[in-house]
Structure formats: structure tokens, C-alpha cells
């Protein structure tokens, strides 16, 4: 099992596939909504949803990062969208979407210690990725099949933006986030 994530290892031990585990997590998510139904439909379609090779729709994973006392929320000012938002990014072939969310928070904020509050989904949504230029090439509009996890980090820990993606990173009160 070397090289497998904790969740993949647990799924293998329990005799379930990672896809089945993700479907079960999405199925348990409440409130039920049309995005949930569409995510389940696409998972059943046997499309490659974990890489950007699927130009129409692919998985992204995000994180709502809170302080241990829940008085602050970490946000990044994303250059592409010209707005403050929660942190996250593309799965890029990784089927462990919690690991993707953790990786993206570390990359986009400079935090070295961040931990899941729970392995359950915090939210799920289908987001439209507008057409844009990336690395000198045009990327057509597409769908981000996004799952969000609730993570926790210490607001006293050093943070810094990832200059190619965001210009600022900061902690906000939940009301301001």
C-alpha cells in the first residue's frame, strides 16, 4: 500500500473503491441539491473527472480554513477571479480530494501545518471556470466539480501568497469572509 493515501488505504482495507467512498460521501451530503445529483451522475459516467484532460468538467477540491476557536477564516485574493475566495485547486489526477485540499492550502497560503476538522464534505458545488489564458494558451470555459473540506490552522503561523495565483492571503472574521 506504499504511495496510497490514508483514505485510499482505508477504502482498500474495507473492500471499497475510492470512487465508491467518494460517491457515499456525496450521497450523505445534506442538503440535497441539483449539484449533488449532477456530481453523482458524472461519477457514474466513467468520464475522467480527476484530470484537466477532461476539458468540459473535472474535480477541484477546496478548503474553508478556520482558526481553532472558529473566530477567523483564511482567504486568498485570487488573481484570476480578481476577488477574495477560499483556497483550493485542481485534483490533477489525485483521487484523494481531501489530500488535494490540504496540498492547495499549503501551496496557496504558505501554511505548513493545517489539519482536517473532519473527513466529511463541508460543501459541494459546481462552479463555472471562465475561459482564460494560462501559460500562453487559451483554456475554454468549463465546470469545476468542487468539494470543500473544513480545515483548521493557527492564525499566528506565518502565511504568504503564492505569487502566480494570488496576491494576498489573510485571516478574516467569519462575518467579513
Regions found by a protein language model. Name each.
Residues 1-38:
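Alpha-helical and coiled-coil interaction segments, frequently adjacent to or embedded
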Residues 28-62:
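Acidic, metal-coordinating catalytic segment for phosphate/diphosphate chemistry
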Residues 50-86:
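N-terminal strand-loop-strand
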Residues 78-80, 90, 165:
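A short beta-strand motif that forms part of the nucleic acid-binding face
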Residues 92-177:
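Unchanged
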Amino acid at each position: 500500500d506504499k504511495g496510497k493515501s490514508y483514505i485510499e488505504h482505508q477504502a482498500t482495507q474495507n473492500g471499497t473503491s475510492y470512487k465508491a467512498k467518494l460517491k457515499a460521501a456525496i450521497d450523505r451530503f445534506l442538503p440535497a441539491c441539483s449539484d449533488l445529483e449532477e456530481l453523482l451522475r458524472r461519477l457514474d459516467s466513467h468520464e475522467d473527472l480527476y484530470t484537466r484532460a477532461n476539458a468540459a468538467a473535472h474535480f477541484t477540491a477546496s478548503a474553508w480554513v478556520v482558526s481553532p476557536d472558529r473566530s477567523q477564516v483564511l482567504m486568498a485574493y485570487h488573481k484570476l477571479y480578481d476577488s477574495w475566495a477560499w483556497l483550493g485547486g485542481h485534483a490533477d489526477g489525485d483521487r484523494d480530494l481531501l489530500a488535494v485540499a490540504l496540498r492547495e492550502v499549503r501551496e496557496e497560503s504558505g501554511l505548513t501545518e493545517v489539519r482536517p476538522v473532519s473527513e466529511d464534505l463541508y460543501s459541494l458545488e459546481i462552479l463555472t471556470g471562465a475561459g482564460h489564458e494560462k501559460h500562453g494558451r487559451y483554456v475554454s470555459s468549463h465546470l469545476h466539480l468542487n468539494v470543500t473540506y473544513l480545515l483548521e490552522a493557527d492564525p499566528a503561523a506565518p502565511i504568504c501568497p503564492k505569487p502566480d495565483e494570488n496576491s494576498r492571503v489573510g485571516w478574516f472574521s467569519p462575518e467579513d469572509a
